[in-house]
Amino acid sequence: MLVYFADLAHDHFKVNQYTPTGIGYLTAYSKFKFGNHVEFRLFKSVNKLLDTYEKEKPDLVGLSNYTWNTGLSKFAGSFIKKRDPSLPIIMGGPNIRIDEKGIEEFLRKTEYVDTYCMFAGEFSVYEILKFLLNQPRNQRTANDLRNHITNGCYSIYNDRLIGNSNYTRPDDLDEIPSPFLTGLMDPFLKEGYYPIL
């Protein structure tokens, strides 16, 4: 299974650019749990994401949602969804209201997002990947994911909001590996991105 996670930023200048630590933690935890059963590729550049997408189609795309990258995520998500409507796209990040009315409004206007992961997403993303891995390849679709309830996530299915905000916290922070110690941030550090610790 191939997964693309993107924490997109404008990359005209490498001024004040930070490593994609959030998606790094999602990846580090799921890599720890799945080993080589899932391959991850991380992106900061929208151009690199879309160029890679054109060469090799993933099984899942995940986008971050911050005030500074809303437009980039929308551009990339809409581009991918237009070309492959059945490809599941998930999103997470703090740039969303946390009440169900606000979540529903967001998902209805952001049609390229199939599932939104609320709060810290390490466990939710792991559960999504586990669900998709347990499906036959032809049932790893956007519609199948929208119909699946994952704790801490919301979707629009059959024209209604489904899901919950039941976020699971780790009992021990050491349960989630560091994306820096696992080497996931090395390519970004080599490109001159600043670490967020």
Feature-to-residue mapping (PLM):
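Glycine- and acidic-residue-enriched helix-capping/strand-helix junction motifs
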Residues: 12-23
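Beta-sheet entry/capping signal
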Residues: 2-3, 88, 114-115, 193-196
